[in-house]
């Protein structure tokens, strides 16, 4: 321990913070160096934080499929089958990482393909999974990607975004999740191979193959195009989980056609028009349907886990508006609370909002724009009004036939002014 003599010549100092032995409780000596108790505590805090942020380290740290599914239920309404598929796939993926090298049997990675109409929850499912597992997450739009060397975004820029999301911690990035949206937009432009290069369709599928299967990507820290003088970060993509999503409009016709015969004439079977919903037909999806849609066989092979999502009906959309932890109605009610007013939606108003989203074919994604449109004038006027106690939205407001009803603290009622 340190010498506590008052002689200044013998005073010892911490080699890290510079404090003297008289300013700290303990000073620990090593070969030609000293460290105080405060610096030791700081080092322990850093180590604890690093351990906490390093993601899942043991099998006990991987949530069970049921635990993952329960958290997904808090944020995503419906889609129970897709949640079960995702929960099992993600649990197995991180269990595989935590037991790598402990057995002679090498467990292959199972990337995931989400298929469902616009606004059904594909992106939200992927985002919520990353939050549950506390791993870096990034999203990419497949329509902006091109083959290397062409104008557009390189595929390796996806890995750069993941690296940025992990604050350039390469080890954490290598255990992250990448969500690639709109993969149905990078299909072959025709069934037959062309003599001209398809740099934004099949070419992007080819470019994605390597990073999805596993490769060491050389990523320029500042992004942009590569050049020989640049320094690169090496990121191994072997353990990165890739989730691809798309609406795949028209895929249901391919599925329906597969079940029909092509015979004609008097002896042919006459089949009635298929009246099943899109989501129900997606449940009968086979890999060959994706090939006919325009995905190349190698790309389909990299996505062994397929989860199909269904259209959201009116009841599901109303539930999305009101029930999740971050439900839209709760968000707008909080905004109005900041203006000391209560926002109330009648039941018929909620049904009408859900009905408009279905008419627009925008699913849950279109709900916010509908609410913004309904509440715009009221949100404009409210900060300048006094004593407004409650704002009521009914079906007539949603249909555009009336403005939200303002109820004042002295119980005087009048329609909101049009801004």
Curated annotation (Swiss-Prot):
Pfam family, any one: ClpB_D2-small
Coiled-coil blocks: none
Domain ClpX-type ZB: 2-55
GO cellular component: HslUV protease complex
Domain of life, source organism: Bacteria
UniProt cross-references to InterPro entries, sorted A to Z: AAA+_ATPase, ATP-dep_Clp_protease_ClpX, ATPase_AAA_core, Clp_ATPase_C, Clp_protease_ATP-bd_su_ClpX, ClpX_bact, P-loop_NTPase, Znf_CppX_C4
SMART domains to which the protein is assigned, alphabetical: AAA, ClpB_D2-small, zf-C4_ClpX
Listed CDD domains: RecA-like_ClpX
Chain residues that bind Zn(2+): 14, 17, 36, 39
Record keywords, A-Z: ATP-binding, Chaperone, Metal-binding, Nucleotide-binding, Zinc
Entry keyword rRNA processing: no
GO terms (BP aspect): cell division; proteolysis involved in protein catabolic process
Positions contributing to ATP binding: 117-124
GO molecular function term, any single one: unfolded protein binding
Free-text function comment from the UniProt entry: ATP-dependent specificity component of the Clp protease. It directs the protease to specific substrates. Can perform chaperone functions in the absence of ClpP.
NCBIfam families assigned: clpX (TIGR00382), PRK05342.1 (NF003745)
Sequence similarity: Belongs to the ClpX chaperone family.
Assembly mode: Component of the ClpX-ClpP complex. Forms a hexameric ring that, in the presence of ATP, binds to fourteen ClpP subunits assembled into a disk-like structure with a central cavity, resembling the structure of eukaryotic proteasomes.
HAMAP family in the cross-refs: ClpX (MF_00175)
Protein name: ATP-dependent Clp protease ATP-binding subunit ClpX
Organism: Dinoroseobacter shibae (strain DSM 16493 / NCIMB 14021 / DFL 12)
Phylogenetic lineage: Bacteria, Pseudomonadati, Pseudomonadota, Alphaproteobacteria, Rhodobacterales
């Amino acid at each position: 321990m340190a010498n506590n003599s008052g002689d200044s010549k013998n005073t010892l100092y911490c080699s890290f913070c510079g404090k003297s032995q008289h300013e700290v409780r303990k000073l620990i000596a090593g070969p030609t160096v000293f460290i105080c108790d405060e610096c030791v505590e700081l080092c322990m805090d850093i180590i604890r934080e690093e351990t906490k942020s390093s993601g899942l380290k043991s099998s006990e740290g991987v949530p069970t499929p049921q635990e993952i599914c329960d958290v997904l239920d808090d944020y995503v309404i419906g889609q129970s089958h897709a949640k079960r598929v995702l929960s099992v796939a993600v649990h197995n993926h991180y269990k595989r990482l935590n037991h790598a090298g402990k057995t002679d049997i090498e467990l292959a990675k199972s990337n995931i393909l989400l298929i469902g109409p616009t606004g059904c929850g594909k992106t939200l499912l992927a985002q919520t999974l990353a939050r549950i597992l506390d791993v870096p997450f990034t999203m990419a739009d497949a329509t902006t990607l091109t083959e290397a060397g062409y104008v557009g975004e390189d595929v390796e820029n996806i890995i750069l975004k993941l690296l940025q999301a992990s604050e350039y911690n390469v080890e954490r990035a290598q255990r992250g999740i990448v969500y690639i949206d709109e993969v149905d937009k990078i299909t072959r432009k025709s069934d037959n191979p062309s003599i001209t290069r398809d740099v934004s369709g099949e070419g992007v599928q080819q470019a994605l193959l390597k990073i999805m299967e596993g490769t060491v990507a050389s990523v320029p820290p500042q992004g942009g195009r590569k050049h020989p003088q640049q320094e690169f970060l090496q990121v191994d993509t072997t353990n990165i989980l890739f989730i691809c999503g798309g609406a795949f409009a028209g895929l249901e016709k391919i599925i329906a056609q597969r079940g029909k015969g092509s015979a004609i004439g008097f002896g042919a079977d006459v089949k009635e028009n298929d009246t099943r919903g899109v989501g129900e037909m997606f449940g009968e999806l086979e890999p060959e349907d994706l090939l006919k849609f325009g995905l190349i066989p190698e790309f389909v092979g990299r996505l062994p886990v397929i989860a199909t999502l269904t259209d959201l009906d009116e009841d599901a959309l109303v539930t999305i508006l009101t029930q999740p932890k971050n439900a839209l109605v709760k968000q707008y009610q909080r905004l109005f609370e900041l203006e000391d007013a209560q926002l109330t939606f009648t039941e018929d108003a909620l049904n009408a909002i859900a009905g408009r989203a279905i008419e627009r074919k925008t699913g849950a994604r279109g709900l916010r724009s509908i609410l913004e449109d309904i509440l715009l004038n009221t949100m404009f006027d409210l900060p300048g009004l006094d004593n407004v106690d409650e704002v009521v939205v009914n079906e007539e407001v949603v249909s555009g036939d009336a403005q939200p009803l303002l109820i004042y603290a002295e119980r005087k009622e009048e329609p909101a002014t049009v801004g």
